[in-house]
């Protein structure tokens, strides 16, 4: 009997010009490129030249810039290639409407919400790197995944680690999940020292190479706070089942504790291609050119309980999870405004959490989200309130 080669898997990469998107294309190339995969859509924002190069080299059918102002530039870059071009919110929704098997959802911020939910409802497997989908709209996003019938494959290294060691037929026996954090550049800093943190010192992550905003989020532990809320929705957990531990070597990416006292951990060198490759190849494991652990050279693995006085973002995550509703969206929206103010020199490092908590308290009475409009409204209110609080503080 003759057996034909299976058709290439159809992929869309939302946010292809970012770090996750570039690493995804790298993994696709390593796993056979066009022989095994068909790139349907690539989306980016301001880096038009890179987006155009990616579209040409991958053979993408559609290239989308999220910024309408860059439409003509992208169209000019891709003139004569046969690659379709679109832009703005409508372009992102056109991208989401493509019939594909797998979507890398790596658009940063709330801009990624609508297209990722739409792709989920169409039934594509979603490799999720966008935090806002679960932090701001967790219940709605999980419902969209169930409606479409696709699989939700986490790409954050911590959630991907849990996904790898979570025994599907033993979910009832999960006692806790333990998210690891390096502790960032201020793991051992005093509260007094943290009051004088600058943007340059905050962006210097000890183990991972990341963009400016996510580096600062990691330094303040807001990134870990968002990951706690994500884990709640991803794995159907209760807030009290989610723990955070500092692990400065970043070798253990997360752990799952079971009712019999066993703890299963996923270890590996800090390289995002491992999580991306696993999400792309699931349920199989790919052969990737990443560093192999040499346990003889590791020497030691250290762990410390985080100090929530110096890192209050972790406490705010628990507060948001306990309150529920749109508190995740409020936390994220307020934090984004505070982060911008810190980068611009208008707010201190420690004050980011103070502003965020004030906004969460002020908007604790907002109703449960019935749809995405409610999520976006909560996000807007949080951002407006955060801006007002900072204006009042400056005036005083």
Swiss-Prot record:
Alphabetized Pfam families for the sequence: DXP_redisom_C (PF08436), DXP_reductoisom (PF02670), DXPR_C (PF13288)
Residues that coordinate or bind 1-deoxy-D-xylulose 5-phosphate: 131, 157-158, 182, 205, 218, 223-224, 227
Top-level EC class: oxidoreductase
Keywords, in A-Z order: Isoprene biosynthesis, Manganese, Metal-binding, NADP, Oxidoreductase
A GO BP annotation: isopentenyl diphosphate biosynthetic process, methylerythritol 4-phosphate pathway involved in terpenoid biosynthetic process
One GO MF term: 1-deoxy-D-xylulose-5-phosphate reductoisomerase activity
Catalyzed reaction equations: 2-C-methyl-D-erythritol 4-phosphate + NADP(+) = 1-deoxy-D-xylulose 5-phosphate + NADPH + H(+)
Cofactor: Mg(2+); Mn(2+)
Keyword NADP: yes
Domain of life, source organism: Bacteria
SUPFAM superfamilies according to UniProt: 1-deoxy-D-xylulose-5-phosphate reductoisomerase, C-terminal domain (SSF69055), Glyceraldehyde-3-phosphate dehydrogenase-like, C-terminal domain (SSF55347), NAD(P)-binding Rossmann-fold domains (SSF51735)
Binding site for NADPH: 17-20, 47, 130, 132, 211
EC nos: 1.1.1.267
The protein's role, per its UniProt record: Catalyzes the NADPH-dependent rearrangement and reduction of 1-deoxy-D-xylulose-5-phosphate (DXP) to 2-C-methyl-D-erythritol 4-phosphate (MEP).
PANTHER family, alphabetized: 1-DEOXY-D-XYLULOSE 5-PHOSPHATE REDUCTOISOMERASE (PTHR30525), 1-DEOXY-D-XYLULOSE 5-PHOSPHATE REDUCTOISOMERASE, CHLOROPLASTIC (PTHR30525:SF0)
Family the UniProt entry places it in: Belongs to the DXR family.
Protein name (record): 1-deoxy-D-xylulose 5-phosphate reductoisomerase
